[in-house]
A protein has these predicted regions:
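Extracellular fibronectin type III
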Residues: 398-436
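Prokaryotic Sec-type signal peptides and long signal-anchor helices
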Residues: 10-11, 390, 412
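Sec-dependent bacterial lipoprotein signal peptides
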Residues: 1-23
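A beta-strand/beta-hairpin structural motif
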Residues: 366-373
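Long luminal/extracellular ectodomains of secretory-pathway precursor proteins
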Residues: 20-364, 376-405
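Sparse, context-dependent recognition of short Cys/His-centered cofactor- or disulfide-binding micro-motifs
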Residues: 5, 10, 44, 355, ...
């Protein structure tokens, strides 16, 4: 299921995973009990991309016997010399992930492609009133509706009458989730951007519980008056990249954000109208693309509703160096290299077709080899075409920081993540053929 591409709530990218803003995004170079050159006991946890524990998978430190995670995803390996490499291997799903150069003793390791645990579902529908629903809203109006809880979120737009139909919800963890329903109405221009004095109403209704398999109908919310502010700034893109989109979200709680609009023009300077929701802040997402491959995304979080002169510098993604495209006779001794993404760590992706094993390497360095997983039944197949690419994640000062309690990727969407700025750079991809 994993594509070479991770992430975003935006309209330009259709990516499989999303990055966590904050939590693990620390610039510290070691973990809380990390160090260099010592002998330690590593006691960590393996989680899936949904944040749930992964049980019964082998965890390996070179030179040490492998150990399987327990039911809670926990593992412990004694007498480990720092810095160390550590791998999560699953022969059944034919995937292996290596973290390079760790010193922290309590890493959280993300098992890419895994979504363990029981998935719960539910939906809710209802009607929004107030604002410009008299009884129908004007044709130029848009009313966004969002349900959000600590475990999940979903959104839709209302019909002109204010009704909204089944917002689908999916979550892991508890069998019931309790959240709030948010609604925002505004008048938009032909491009879908809010106009001056365009915000007509905002409402929130809390304490809504959704049970697994539950369907809630007749959920309602009433809009109250909301003011309009102006939000301005400038985007700077890396050399060779073109600005593709700017998206703006209103963060209305720690677990909820309302998508305001997407501006898909290439204009670097922007001026938008935003809602004066008490206690809310703005999240700005800026996306840039490079002809021939390459994607850069930067998020500015915690911005004031009426912030002016905001400056966003999109970080330059990694660029592949060697081997050249369509290289042949590649084995686990061949070095793959790329340029660094400043302020981040690199996830190197080696992916073959069909049932071929997949390999992932998380490193702060600018080179890596394909992990030799033959002892675990995941040897590199002969004469097989593979694709490789490098994704950068930041801000992380080290792989230790990226192995913090929150990990570096979560199944939640960007607007639901913790406060803080973040960036991702996605390289172009190349192919190679393995050795006979």
């Amino acid at each position: 299921m994993l594509k070479h591409m991770f992430f975003t709530g935006g309209s330009v990218l259709a990516l499989a995973l999303t990055v966590l803003i904050g939590g693990g995004c620390s610039k510290s170079s070691t973990g809380p009990s990390g160090g260099t050159g010592g002998v330690v006991t590593v006691t960590g946890k393996v989680v899936g991309q949904n944040g749930q524990a992964v049980a019964s998978v082998p965890v390996v430190v070179p030179g040490k016997p492998s150990t399987n995670t327990d039911a809670g995803g926990n593992f412990s390996i004694a007498n480990v010399t720092t810095p160390y490499d550590i791998s999560v291997v699953d022969a059944a799903s034919k995937a292996a992930l290596v973290y390079k150069g760790l010193t922290r003793t309590d890493p959280t390791l993300l098992f890419i492609g895994s979504t363990p645990g029981t998935s719960h579902t539910g939906n809710l529908s209802g009607k929004i009133s107030g604002g410009e629903f008299t009884p129908n809203q004007p044709a130029a109006d848009i009313t966004r509706v969002v349900f959000a809880s600590p475990e999940t979120s979903g959104s839709t737009n209302t019909a002109v009458s204010g009704t909204f139909g089944a917002i689908p919800l999916n979550w892991f963890g508890p069998t019931a989730t309790t959240g709030s329903l948010y609604a925002l109405q505004f008048t938009a221009d032909v491009a879908g951007l809010p106009v001056a004095a365009g915000y007509k109403g905002y409402g929130v209704r809390s304490g809504i519980a959704v049970n697994d398999g539950g369907t809630l109908t007749n959920q309602f919310d009433t809009l109250q008056t909301v003011t309009t502010s102006q939000f301005t700034g400038t985007i700077t893109v890396p050399a060779g990249y073109a600005l593709a989109a700017k998206l703006v979200y209103a963060r209305v709680s720690s677990s909820a954000a309302i998508t305001l609009f997407s501006d898909n023009t290439a204009n670097a300077a922007f001026s938008y109208f935003t809602p004066g929701i008490p206690g809310a802040s703005l999240l700005l997402e800026a996306e840039a693309l490079k002809a021939g491959g390459g994607t850069a995304v930067t998020w500015k979080n915690g911005l004031a509703i009426g912030a002016t002169g905001v400056s966003v510098n999109i970080v330059t993604p990694p660029e592949l160096s060697l081997p050249v495209n369509a290289a042949t006779a590649v084995d686990t001794t061949v070095t793959f290299s790329w340029t660094a993404m400043t302020g981040g760590v690199h996830l190197v992706i080696f992916q073959g077709g069909g049932s071929s094993p997949r390999y992932y390497v998380l490193t702060a360095a600018t080179s890596a080899t394909i992990p030799n997983m033959k002892p675990f039944g995941l040897g590199l197949p002969a004469v097989t075409v593979y694709t490789w690419a490098v994704d950068g994640f930041g801000p992380f000062g080290s792989v230790d920081a990226a192995a913090g309690p929150a990990g570096f990727i979560t199944g939640l969407s960007i607007p639901l993540a913790a406060s803080g700025d973040a960036f991702v750079g996605i390289s172009a991809s190349r192919t190679f053929t393995t050795a006979p």
